[in-house]
Amino acid sequence: MLTCKKLVLLPVFALTLSGCASEPTDPQFVASKSLQPYMQDDYQTYLADTQEWLLENRVFLTNDKQTELSAVAPFELVPQNPNGQGVLLVHGLGDSPFSYVDIAPDLAAQGYLVRVILLPGHGTRAADLSLPEIEDWQNIVAHHYELLNEQVEGVWLGGFSTGANLVTALAYQHPEVKGLLLFSPAFKPRDSLARFSPLASWFVDWESQLPEDNYTRYNSLHMKGAATYYKSSAVVRDYIDDAAYDKPTFVMLSEADETIDSQYAVEQFSEKFTSSHSELLWFGETQYKDERITSYSMNLPNQKIVSASHISLVFSPENPIYKRDGEVRLCFREQPEGTPKDCSEVPSDQVWFSAYGDGEETQVRARISWNPYFDQSMQKMNRFLKDNKN
């Protein structure tokens, strides 16, 4: 059976499609029958139900189902010495709770009850990003904020990329939220053509279809998912445009971010995130007059690092998947002549790491997927939280 489509448009990431495409046969590209339930009355039931859902609906990439489930399932960390407050963390588009595998334990060690949710459409198969509407993502974040708020005496909201959009919009609606932790906030996409993605999603199924070989996230992107992300960015920009946010906010941004407009985000931080206690860590070379902004140079030739990427800020240099010599290496498409087709065959100490597109074409290059300043970043975050706990 053929699915016929005709579209000449450049949405999201410079896509042009015209003609007919075959119905997918790879189960990664065939959606589940429905979304997982997410409005349970309590968090423990949500965890159990989601584990069962993932086991039944996930297209597993390896024979080690437990490792894969542990990577993508929502989780809770209960602190040994509770401080009375909690943190709700929300991942980004195509990602999973694994985005917080390094950050969440640090928060729990500071006494916070930490909960990480799984956005509907994630953790199972790439085609499931065709299923959720923006309301599903908004509703799950709002619902689990309410559940956590019943258990603690104050909630911080944290978000990576698209997750940052969702939690920021919710924080505007709930002035009782203690504050925000934002990692690579995707307030505005770097590609201005992303605004066409909601229209394109009516005609085009996939922004990109790639082999799925990373069990922590999707490599492929369904156009409906791209459109839903864009809607989340439009919503949060409306809130930011309409009013300042005066609660303490901690932000981490890469100057070279290849996915989002980080310059827009830093400008909004200076203009609209007005608390004198707010803080932004800028991973790049620009120095800002705003005293709340600390810059960390990413020109690190001794480490063969050129710049920070969209995903790198949240992962430790010791992360087994994303460290320099980790299980996953995100190779650039263009490599010097003679480079193996899979650049992961090149010893890690011979590879230069950066945001996509950065670096010298004469060098073997890969997307950086860890934060060389991770320990310093966590120290800054912990100090920020301690100073703003009350």
Residue ranges with predicted function:
Residues 18-19:
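C-terminal motif of bacterial Sec signal peptides marking the signal peptidase cleavage site
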Residues 34-82:
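N-terminal cap/lid segment of alpha/beta-hydrolase-fold proteins
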Residues 69-122:
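Short, surface-exposed "cap/lid" segments of acyl-processing enzymes
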Residues 76-81, 221-362, 366-386:
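Serine-hydrolase catalytic core
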Residues 124-151, 156:
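Catalytic nucleophile-loop/oxyanion-hole region of alpha/beta-hydrolase
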Residues 158-163, 167:
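Gly/Ala-rich beta-loop-alpha elbow adjacent to hydrolase catalytic centers
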Residues 181-192:
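Active-site nucleophile loop of the alpha/beta-hydrolase fold
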